[in-house]
């Protein structure tokens, strides 16, 4: 029983609200076209069709019945002509609305174009019974197209707002909360409306021919900032400005054509902007997905490097130790045999060389410092191991990065960039000083390696010297690596602290 009364109250409220809005829009339309029956085909048609495209089918009889009652009442009061044509046309419009009603809850650019096509088809069907009335058939088509494309998209905007907003019941907890008026958006809308109104009313007579082109300015501005909703709201502002300047038009057809043109512009531009935004969102998701995959690949690569380094260290290290031990035994057993003793010493030296080579290889595969030290300590250890001071290179480290904010991939990447950059400086730069700086800035990790040497040879920025691998690692984490050689070489790395 409660459900029945709730439904009944909703239906009655919809009936009276729609009837009041329909009559107000009919009065405005009558001011523009000055014929009662044609006025019903302008904005009232757009209101009824716009609501039918958005609301469930159960409310269609309420809207259609309210319109028929109003049309019948107007026929008695103001001698409204062609009453059967209006009613037959309104029934015919149910066909395209019914075909597109299943897609009304979608929120993509295709919905805008689909509803635009439904509006066009409904306008054709509404004006179809007027074919026997001569020139009035074209007037009916122009009126229905203009009214439908002007008001129906606005119904879509309001319906989207009402259905996408979370509504909470009014309670004591909400009374004390301030109202968010979103003043910046309101001021932005108001300024554009004033500009649009001034362009229609305030331009000199010699510039009046440019006023139709000015209608696109608010549409473009709001579409750029707010997407398809902004484009459709801009068409409503333009429609109000055009109606306010109706006295400047020599013929109502000029006004209707202007309304129709700017409504089509708003609808198509809104669909285009929505399509562009959807593509951008899709590209951003794919880019984020690719970066996540690349980061996982880096983590997998480091895991494999760590396992290989451990196996090399355990197996080859033990083997080399055994070789050195056996070589020492041979030397002691053959102390009187100079040739054998010399061969034992050579074997021991070669095994030491192999051990050093394997040790360097292990350092390249997986820096052992990262397993035992923090990143700052690992970089200091790297500076000591490279013996820069013995090579006449003064080093300075300024590290201000919080390591708790770093992922394992970022730690390894920053260390390897430092490792490769220092190797290039030692081998090619002929530098006397090198500076490493690391800091956090605006949710980004910054690393700069700078020396006062001769710079990299020409053409080495794109290939060689480990730069390709460095760039690939940094790019895989969503960062950038730049190299400049103005005074020495400067390697700059910028990584997002957390890639989303």
UniProtKB/Swiss-Prot annotation:
Residue numbers on the Cytoplasmic membrane side: 274-500
Membrane topology listed for this record: Multi-pass membrane protein
Transmembrane spans: 8-28, 78-98, 112-132, 140-160, 185-205, 207-224, 231-249, 253-273
Modified residues (Phosphohistidine): 313
Lineage: superkingdom: Bacteria
One cellular component (GO) term of this entry: plasma membrane
Single GO BP term: signal transduction
Reactions catalysed: ATP + protein L-histidine = ADP + protein N-phospho-L-histidine
Pfam families: HATPase_c, HisKA_3, MASE1
Keyword field: ATP-binding, Cell inner membrane, Cell membrane, Hydrolase, Kinase, Membrane, Nucleotide-binding, Phosphoprotein, Protein phosphatase, Transferase, Transmembrane, Transmembrane helix, Two-component regulatory system
Subcellular location: Cell inner membrane
Domain Histidine kinase: 311-499
CDD domains: HATPase_UhpB-NarQ-NarX-like (cd16917)
Keyword rRNA-binding attached: no
GO MF entries: ATP binding; phosphoprotein phosphatase activity; phosphorelay sensor kinase activity; protein dimerization activity
EC number: 2.7.13.3, 3.1.3.-
Entry comment on modification after translation: Autophosphorylated.
Purpose: Part of the UhpABC signaling cascade that controls the expression of the hexose phosphate transporter UhpT. UhpB functions as a membrane-associated protein kinase that autophosphorylates in response to interaction with UhpC, and subsequently transfers its phosphate group to the response regulator UhpA. Can also dephosphorylate UhpA.
Name of the protein in question: Signal transduction histidine-protein kinase/phosphatase UhpB
Gene: uhpB
């Amino acid at each position: 029983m409660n459900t029945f009364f709730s439904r009944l109250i909703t239906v009655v409220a919809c009936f009276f609200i729609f009837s009041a809005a329909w009559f107000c829009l009919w009065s405005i339309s009558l001011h523009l076209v000055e014929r009662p029956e044609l006025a019903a085909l302008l904005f009232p048609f757009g209101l009824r069709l716009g609501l039918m495209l958005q609301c469930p089918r159960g409310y269609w009889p309420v809207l259609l019945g309210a319109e028929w009652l109003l049309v019948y009442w107007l026929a008695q009061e103001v001698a409204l002509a062609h009453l059967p044509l209006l009613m037959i046309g309104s029934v015919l419009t149910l066909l395209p609305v019914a075909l597109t009603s299943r897609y009304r809850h979608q929120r993509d650019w295709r919905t805008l174009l689909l509803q635009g096509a439904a509006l066009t088809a409904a306008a054709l069907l509404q004006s179809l019974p007027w074919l026997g009335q001569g020139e009035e058939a074209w007037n009916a088509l122009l009126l229905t197209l203009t009214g439908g494309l002007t008001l129906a998209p606005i119904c879509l905007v309001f319906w989207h707002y009402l259905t996408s907003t979370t509504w909470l019941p009014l309670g004591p907890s909400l009374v004390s909360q301030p109202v968010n008026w979103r003043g910046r958006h309101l001021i932005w809308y108001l300024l554009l409306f004033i500009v649009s109104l001034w362009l229609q009313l305030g331009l000199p007579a010699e510039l009046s021919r440019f006023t139709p082109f000015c209608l696109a300015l608010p549409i473009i501005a709001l579409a750029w900032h707010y997407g398809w909703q902004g484009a459709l709201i801009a068409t409503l502002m333009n429609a109000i400005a055009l109606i306010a300047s109706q006295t400047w038009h020599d013929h109502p057809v000029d006004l209707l054509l202007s309304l129709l043109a700017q409504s089509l512009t708003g609808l198509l531009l809104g669909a285009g902007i929505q399509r562009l935004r959807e593509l951008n969102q899709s590209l951003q998701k794919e880019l984020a997905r690719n970066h996540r995959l690349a980061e996982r690949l880096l983590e997998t690569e480091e895991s494999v490097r760590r396992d290989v380094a451990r196996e090399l260290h355990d197996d080859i290290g033990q083997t080399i130790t055994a070789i050195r031990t056996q070589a020492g035994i041979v030397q002691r057993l053959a102390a009187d045999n100079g040739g054998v003793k010399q061969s034992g010493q050579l074997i021991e030296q070669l095994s030491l060389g192999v051990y050093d080579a394997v040790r360097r290889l292990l350092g390249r595969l997986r820096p052992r410092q990262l397993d035992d030290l923090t990143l700052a300590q690992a970089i200091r250890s790297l500076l000591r191991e490279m013996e820069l001071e013995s090579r006449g290179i003064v080093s300075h480290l300024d590290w201000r990065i919080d390591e708790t904010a770093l992922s394992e991939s970022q730690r390894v990447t920053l260390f390897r960039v430092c490792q490769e950059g220092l190797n290039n400086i030692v081998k090619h730069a002929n530098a006397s000083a090198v500076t490493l700086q690391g800091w956090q800035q605006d949710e980004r990790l910054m690393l700069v390696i700078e020396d006062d040497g001769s710079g990299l040879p020409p053409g080495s920025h794109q290939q060689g010297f480990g730069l390709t691998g460095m760039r690939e690692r940094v790019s895989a984490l969503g960062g950038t690596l730049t190299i400049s050689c103005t005074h020495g070489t400067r390697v700059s790395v910028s990584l997002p602290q957390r890639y989303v």
